[in-house]
Amino acid sequence: MEQTLFVRDPGKLSFTLPANAQLIVGDALNPKGLYEAIKGHDIVYANLAGEVDVQAKNIVSAMDKAGVKRLIFVNSLGIYKEVPGKFGVWNQNEIGKYLAPYRAAADTIEASDLDYTILRAAWLTDHDEVDFEITQRDEPFKGTIVSRKSVGALITDIIDSPETWSRANLGVNKPNTDGDVPVLD
């Protein structure tokens, strides 16, 4: 499998570029550069920050123009106020003011004709484990944490079987981590 890494700042990469990868330095806020990076590919995986609403519009447009249909887009928990209880209140207090662009990004993607999977991950840990469960868009979010390795495993599963989780919007968390706040040790 060949891959193209489209990054704003290659200095932030903490790994050696794999032999099957090419690096393109660019910005998802630049539609032309984004199109050039996307054309000819089968799947787009996006894990962004900042103006994610504008970036999502640009990605959808570039994918449409390039004829690429499969998108995996990492978003944030809480965009639908789907996080229940004290943890939901805590989460809203911590990141609620940042969530509007993430919600707009999800809305843009869901309104498109793309074959998308949106992943709303719980608070991320660096635990060396793959242990996760999934909730659907309209279900209450479960748990408070999930390992980056778990989210990566789910993304890899979707890339390996692109027909899975088609046009799905999923919450991802570690089972049995419900609580009032995430334990991030």
PLM region spans:
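NAD(P)-cofactor binding segment of oxidoreductase domains
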Residues: 43-74, 102-104
